[in-house]
C-alpha cells in the first residue's frame, strides 16, 4: 500500500505531532506499506521506511502571520491557519504531481495545522483516492481558535464539514473528541470513525519492579514536563506549594519544570520564595527529557482551563508509560481528568489549593499510599498495539 502523507510539521524536531508521527510511520510493516511524507522542513531521518518530499514554505507569508497576531487580527490567523497560505497550496500541486506519476493507494492527512485536511479534501475531489483524516487536536470545537466575527467561525464549520462528508476514515486520539465530532456531523458522515491512541517510543515500565514505593534519595521529586503559558498556568500549584512549605519549612521536596514557563509564574516563584524547592529547567531536547522521566517520583500535568476541553496532551501518554503516579490540575469534564480518574491517579480543580497541598504532603510523608495507579495503562500506547489497529483499518479501504 502506497500513500501520500500530508503532514507539514512532520519533520519539526520540537513539534509534538511530528515526534509522534516520526515514530509511527517507520514502524508500519515495511513489506506492505510505503509512504511519501509531504513536509515543510528537511530533517534527516535515519532509515528507509518512508521518503520525504520537501515542500518549502513561503517565508514572506509567515511574516503576515506575525503581523496579524501583533495587530490582534485573530480571525485572519485562524482562517483556517497561516499554513494554508504559506504551504498548503504548494503542497497540493506537489502531491498532485506525485499521484499522477506514481501508484498511490490512499491519502493520509494530519492536523495540526488543520489546513492539511483541506489539501486532502482537494486531492480526494480531484483523484477519487481514499482519504484518511487524522485529528490530534479539535478543529471547529477548539477553544483556542477564538474568533471575533461569526463569519469566520461559520467558515471553520463549513470546512470541517467537508472532512466529515468526504473522508473515508476519520481518526481521533480519544473518544471524547470522536463523540463531539459525531454530535456535529453524524448525519452526514459517510466514512468510518475510529480511535487510534497516540504512539510512543518509550518502552512501558513497571514501577513495582523498577522503582521502590518510596521516594528516591528520600526527597520527593515532582516533574512537570511540557510548556506552560497564559492558557496553562502553574499559579495554583505554586500557591499550594507555598502553603505546604509554610506548614513544613524543612520540606523534602524538589519540583522540576521542564520546558518553557510562563513569565507570570516565574514571578510567583520569586515572590513566594520557592527557589529552594523549585527547579526551572527550561526547554531541553527530547533526549535530555529522558532523565527527568526516569528520576521523578511523581508527575504533574496542568491542563488548559477551557470548556469543552477535548485535548489529549502528548506528555500524558509518556507519563503513563513510566507507570509512576500522576496528579493533574484540570476541569472534571476534560479528557485529562477522565484519563486520570480511569487510571486511579488524582485530579484537582483549578481552585483547589488546599486539596493539592494536602496531596503533596501525603506524597512526601507516605509515598507508597499514592502508588495505587494502574501501572499497565501505558501498554495501550505501545508501538505494536497502535500499529495493529491502524493496519486493520487500512485493510478495509
Where are these regions (language model features)?
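Carbohydrate-associated surface elements
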Residues: 176, 198-199
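N-terminal subdomain of nucleotide-sugar transferases
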Residues: 1-58, 169, 384
Amino acid at each position: 500500500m502506497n500513500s501520500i502523507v500530508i503532514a507539514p510539521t512532520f519533520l519539526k524536531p520540537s513539534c509534538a505531532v511530528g515526534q509522534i508521527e516520526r515514530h509511527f510511520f517507520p514502524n508500519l510493516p515495511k513489506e506492505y506499506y510505503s509512504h511519501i511524507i509531504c513536509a515543510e522542513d528537511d530533517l534527516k531521518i535515519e532509515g528507509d521506511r518512508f521518503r520525504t518530499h520537501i515542500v518549502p514554505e513561503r517565508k514572506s507569508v509567515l511574516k503576515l502571520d506575525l503581523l496579524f497576531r501583533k495587530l490582534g487580527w485573530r480571525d485572519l490567523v485562524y482562517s483556517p491557519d497561516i499554513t494554508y497560505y504559506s504551504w498548503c497550496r504548494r503542497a497540493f500541486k506537489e502531491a498532485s504531481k506525485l499521484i499522477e506519476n506514481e501508484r498511490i493507494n490512499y491519502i493520509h492527512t494530519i492536523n495540526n495545522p488543520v489546513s492539511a485536511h483541506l489539501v486532502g479534501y482537494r486531492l480526494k475531489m480531484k483523484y477519487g483516492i481514499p482519504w484518511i483524516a487524522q485529528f490530534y487536536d479539535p478543529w471547529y470545537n477548539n477553544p483556542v481558535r477564538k474568533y471575533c466575527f461569526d463569519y469566520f467561525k461559520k467558515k471553520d464549520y463549513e470546512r470541517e464539514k467537508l472532512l466529515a462528508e468526504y473522508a473515508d476514515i476519520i481518526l481521533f486520539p480519544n473518544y471524547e473528541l470522536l463523540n463531539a465530532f459525531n454530535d456535529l456531523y453524524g448525519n452526514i458522515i459517510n466514512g468510518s470513525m475510529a480511535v487510534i491512541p497516540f504512539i510512543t517510543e518509550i518502552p512501558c515500565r513497571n514501577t513495582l519492579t523498577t522503582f521502590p514505593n518510596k521516594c528516591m534519595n528520600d526527597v520527593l521529586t515532582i516533574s512537570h514536563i511540557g510548556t506552560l503559558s497564559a492558557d496553562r498556568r502553574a499559579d495554583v500549584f505554586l500557591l499550594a506549594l507555598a502553603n505546604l512549605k509554610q506548614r513544613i519549612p524543612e520540606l523534602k521536596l524538589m519540583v522540576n519544570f521542564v520546558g518553557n514557563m510562563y513569565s507570570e509564574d516565574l514571578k510567583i516563584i520569586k515572590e513566594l520564595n520557592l527557589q529552594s524547592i523549585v527547579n526551572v529547567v527550561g526547554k531541553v531536547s527530547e533526549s535530555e527529557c529522558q532523565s527527568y522521566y526516569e528520576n521523578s517520583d511523581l508527575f504533574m500535568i496542568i491542563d488548559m482551563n477551557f470548556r469543552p476541553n477535548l485535548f489529549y496532551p502528548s506528555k500524558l501518554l509518556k507519563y503513563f508509560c513510566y507507570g509512576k503516579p500522576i496528579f493533574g490540575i484540570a476541569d472534571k469534564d476534560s479528557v485529562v481528568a477522565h484519563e486520570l480518574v480511569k487510571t486511579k491517579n488524582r485530579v484537582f480543580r483549578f481552585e483547589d489549593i488546599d486539596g493539592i497541598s494536602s496531596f503533596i504532603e501525603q506524597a512526601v510523608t507516605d509515598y507508597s499510599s499514592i502508588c495505587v495507579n494502574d501501572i499497565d495503562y501505558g501498554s495501550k500506547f505501545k508501538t505494536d498495539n497502535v500499529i495493529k489497529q491502524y493496519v486493520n483499518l487500512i485493510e478495509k479501504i
